[in-house]
Amino acid sequence: MKHQVQHKLLSIRRKRKQINEQPELREIIADPIQSDEFWKDLFLVRPLENVEKGKALQLAWKVFCEFESPDYAPEGTEEFKKCLNDDAYLAGIRYYGAFDEEKLVGMLGIWEEKRHVCFFFVDGEYQRLGIGKLFKRMREDFSGRTITLNSSPCGLPFYKALGFTTTDSEQTVNGIRFTPMAYK
């Protein structure tokens, strides 16, 4: 197992070195679809067990505070924190995780009944490394059905690259800025 971990770390380091030495690769990995091929087999993507949901929500909060919260009014940050601790809000969500060995590095949550993605967060060290595979896995499970989400301002280019389209203009509700989107 130790050898596998070292091999995987070397693989990730090699890929990062390749990117630094070949700037044209940046365009490939900026595209979530093409980056899947580049980073394939480095991350395990699977549905989360009930006991793993707490870690997923902790990851969501950590990443939100690091990347999203600075663009929100305090009201928006408090609203998001409230959602993470609200059992009624969290009911009916199916969670998926991306793992680097045993470490949860990405999470996606979708309300099954509404087919609405309510969470998608990736640890900062792992962003732009193909964790968008979570969407591929989720789309397989919900194939043939429209999936919706509310994108943060910084997430719009990513979701558009995955094939989501905007369905309305940007809105702010309880301090949370978002643009409604759908994937058909």
PLM regions: where:
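Conserved GNAT acetyl-CoA-binding A-motif
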Residues: 141-154
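Conserved acetyl-CoA-binding loop-helix of GNAT-fold acetyltransferases
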Residues: 128-140
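Conserved beta-hairpin
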Residues: 94-106
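Conserved GNAT-fold acetyl-CoA-binding loop/helix
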Residues: 57, 61-85
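A short helix-loop-beta-strand connector motif used in the catalytic cores of GNAT acetyltransferases and
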Residues: 84-97, 116
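Conserved active-site alpha-helix within GNAT-family acetyltransferase domains
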Residues: 153-178
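A short, internal acetyl-CoA/4′-phosphopantetheine-binding micro-motif in the GNAT/acyltransferase core
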Residues: 120-127
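A short beta-loop-alpha structural element at the N-terminal edge
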Residues: 43-58
